Amino acid sequence: MFNAAVLTVSDRCFRGERPDSAGPLVAELLKDAGYQVVQTAIVPDEQPRIEQILREIAGAGSVQLLLTTGGTGFSPRDVTPEATLAVCTRLTPGIPEAMRCASMGVTNRAMLSRAQAGIRHGTLIVNLPGSPKAARENLEAVLPALAHGLEMLSGRPADCAAESSAE
């Protein structure tokens, strides 16, 4: 079992003007997949704040998977991808590519996603959209393969040649 954290990035949710619906949904999907969600938080669309909490969570060493939701669009305040790129030491471009590819079967607006994914220390950080529907679709597209990546990242023995339903 891996530990996970969910970070909602939204000015309106942070100010209490709108309930956070994507963050709890993402946390529930993770729990259903066997992850232990050990931390959730809401931050405003401010790059320094996002970077700070990404560094704090990844730096604590207790979370292997950190999912963000929100801030991946074209709005001038959508800066989650930039914050993610600023803190990650290794990028994992296949994850957002897979999410966009899967989402293109639902809507051609998927090509507008600027989501990123990467690694900081032993934590995989993945950006999800802020819409609950899109967050679910994107997470469901990649979740089956993430455990294998997390096993490799954590140094657990994993047979890279083994076939699985996630491939």
Segments from the language model and where they lie:
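Non-catalytic beta/alpha edge segments that cap or flank active sites
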Residues: 1-167
